[in-house]
Structures are given as structure tokens and as C-alpha cells.
Amino acid sequence: MTNARQIFVETLTELAVKDPRIILIVGDVGFSYIEDFAKQFPKQFLNAGVTEQSFMGMAAGLALAGWKPYVYSMIPFVTMRNYEQLRNDVCYHSANVKVIGVQGSVHYKFLGFSHNIVPDDEDVKILQHLPNLKIYIPTPEEVRQVVLESYSQTNPAYIRL
């Protein structure tokens, strides 16, 4: 089975080697996948902790200053907890922020409903009305192509892994 998160990090690593403007911002998650990126690119990595509203606002500001931020966290944390910042700061300004949501449905059911999306397309239903936001829902085999395509564009994007 192909792992979408691992493919995402590998592809982002390839891009970060060539582009020092890439910065990966995580919300205190993903350590089994992002540790190598963090070690290889310490100046292009920020663990913002559980500050979803703040890290989305930071990403918007960084994008408007010429950086290429990728915000990575569990789906509810990058779509619901910071919806206002995503809407107002990222989408309305068409900021070049790539939002990476991981683990749909009830993958984290042992952590309660705050860590899950039910129904499975809840995130897409919430985001589909936002201006300038391109939504990608790739299969694991499509992740590399989607990351490369979204990198080449300057609009905000949501990639659901």
C-alpha cells in the first residue's frame, strides 16, 4: 500500500532543495513522516504547536511576503479550527498557502469527534465555497503530481491526504 503522507513529504523535500522559500508549518503532528524534513531544512520548518488560528495567519503573512508555506495537520485542525483565518487571510487575499489535511473519516476515533470528520466529506463541503481555493483529493498514486501542480500555482490550495 502506498502512503500518501510519505509521498507528500518526499515530494516537498525535492522541492525544498531547489526552493528555499518553501516552509513547512505543522500543528504538532506528523512526526513519523516529517522528522527528516525538519532535520534537513531547520530554517524551512516550524512546529507551531496547537495554535491553528495563529499558524494559518502566519502562513498567510509569510505567503504575502514571498514565502511558500505548506500547513500540515489533521483535517479538522486545518479546516475547522482556523476557518476564519483560512477564509479571510488566505483565500480572500489569494495567498499562496498550501493546506495539507491528513487522515479523513474517523481515523483518530479513539481521540473523539474533535479529531475526526463525519461525514467523510465534511471538510470539502466546508471549503468548497471559499474563493480562490483549489481543492485536491488525490489517491496515493496521484499525490506527487498534485503537489508538483499546486507548487507551480500561486493560488491557495487544499490537499486532502
Regions found by a protein language model. Give the residues of each.
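Thiamine diphosphate
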Residues: M1-L161
